[in-house]
Amino acid sequence: EFHALEVEKLWSRVWQLACLDDEIPNVGDYHVYEVADMSFLVVRTEDGIKAFRNSCLHRGRLLRESNGKGARNLRCAFHGWAWNLDGSMKEIPCEWDFPSVRKEDYALPEALVDTWQGFVFINPDRDAAPLADFLGNLGDHFAKCTFDRRYKAAHVEKIMRVNWKACQEAFMESYHVVATHPTLMEDLGDANSRYDTYENFSRAISPHAVESPHLANMAHYERLEDGKQFARYRHPMNGHIYERVKLGLVRVIDLDGHESHFDDEATWIDGPIVQADPHLCKWIGGPTPSGFLDVPLTLPDPPDGVDTPAEIRAWIAAQRRDTARDTVGKNIDPDDFSDAEVLDAMYYSVFPNWSPWGVFNTLFYRWRPYGNDPDMCIFEVMTFPVAPDPDNKPAPAEVRRLGPDDDWTIATELGAAAKIFQQDSINLPHVQTGLMAQEQQEVVFANYNETKIRDFWENMFRWLEIGETNVSITPRDR
């Protein structure tokens, strides 16, 4: 019932990101955009971009099942009814047999279309307010390097066994880092993140090149001198060492030297230590991209006189600017960006379902319902680096599709980030199952660390026209 309400009140009325302008560059190019049980054709015409309901007006067959190039018309493969690229009716085989059908009345139903920084948006509600009004001042946050000066270098789409909202919530905060991503704690001030909300979007800034404040009182915390990023790692919270024995097998050594073995799902095999961190077991013992197992744990070696954390952070930022200057110097001036813009994780959540990151962290996310199944979703990870030459951008990457049981590391184009997404994927199916099992039928959000999630739900209440005074949103609705 809640999913049906979302389709009626949200997906049928809200501006949503459909594709890239670069993905349909020429007349006749088209992109199929699907959300819930709705399907749209986004088409490049002689006069610009249009979006139509992807359904034949004869007997309902999809006009196109996948993206394509250079179409001269939109012809249904079932009986041959055809429309021009502008949506007007072109042809009906045996037209004499349809005396009630007038071509001028059978144009394809349109959705609103607009663009923003190289992205194409659609809105099924033809009476909706303009996209510019919906996005507000979002463009100001990306003015130093707009997305139309970047290119899509990777695009991975994975089916997840979790509702699209619960999946998205996992990427709205850094609060989960201490438990889910222990390998990030040495370089991420997770609990020191800043959260800001705007009308239809929110932002988080999680500082890098600083340690997590959770490590401040860890007396046993010490970085392994002979450690390896993906093969031998000391857990920063309890000091246990996790070593890769082989694919799927991890040795865990505690502070007293006791050893046990676990598989990469943290299932105990032997030894006196009977519990292990499932996220670190997957990180160390799970599938790993080629060449990553030998990556050492190395700290930057700053020059003399660079001693304090603030000085080291500024030095690392300067190095990143120099690296960027060599690769994107024609497009942006790295000196125009602050240390925070260069180093930190700046991630936005634009209602209802997409998340762009800042210039120097190229990640970009989108979530959609998986058809009409509220217990599953489609989670997409893209990367948008700055184009070295803004006048000669590479073509957008093709989509790699992963099933619910596929490991993220299959997507080698994501590099080490694939390992991080795999850690998140350990939690999410169990979040979905656990929400269904709750007795109290409510969840609790942190006052500050989960600000973005609170903001998301305020927007959901508003769009679904639900008053908190008369309707209870239970975990089943998430």
Residue spans of the language-model regions?
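Short Pro/Gly-enriched beta-strand edge/turn motifs at strand-loop
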Residues: 12-23, 92-96, 345-351
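N-terminal acidic leader/helix
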Residues: 233-234, 240
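Rieske [2Fe-2S] iron-sulfur-binding domain
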Residues: 23-126, 130-141
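C-terminal catalytic domain of Rieske-type non-heme iron oxygenases
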Residues: 43, 54, 114, 119-226, ...
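Mixed-charge, Lys/Arg-enriched low-complexity segments
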Residues: 260-294
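A short, structured beta-strand/loop element
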Residues: 240-260
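A charge-rich, low-complexity, intrinsically flexible signal that marks solvent-exposed coils, linkers
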Residues: 234-235, 266
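Glycine/alanine-rich phosphate-binding loops at beta-alpha junctions
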Residues: 2-36
